[in-house]
Amino acid sequence: MFMEEFFIVFPEGDIQEVPGRLPFNTLVDMNGNVLSLPLPTNKMIAFRVARITTSEKKGSSETFHFLELMSAEELLSYVKSGRTVVDGRF
């Protein structure tokens, strides 16, 4: 039996298991769920999958998705027009 495990690695080094592989450069929430685009607002915590590594051993593989925290300013390009938050205001 071959076992595949998938993890997200937060910028501070914490690791959390996720149910499956995440595409490179995808936006995800704190639980590793892919965010639907366009985003409703830029006032949210979102990460970008910045790097992916896979470690294979006999009978198993571990895939690590390294995340990068996105700023509110960076998220503006992913938001519906007309509903953005800048400096804490809509």
Segments from the language model and where they lie:
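Short beta-strand-centered aromatic/proline hotspots
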Residues: 39-55
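A structural detector for beta-sheet-dominated domains
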Residues: 9-11, 31, 50, 68-70
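Mixed-charge, Lys/Arg-rich low-complexity intrinsically disordered regions
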Residues: 1-24
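Acidic surface patches and DE-rich sequence motifs
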Residues: 10, 29, 55-57
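Intrinsically disordered, low-complexity, charged/polar segments
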Residues: 2-8, 68-90
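A generic structural signal for short beta-strands and their flanking turns/coil linkers
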Residues: 24, 43-45, 63
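Short coil-to-beta transition motif at edge beta-strands of beta-rich domains
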Residues: 18-40
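Short, solvent-exposed secondary-structure boundary/capping segments
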Residues: 55-70
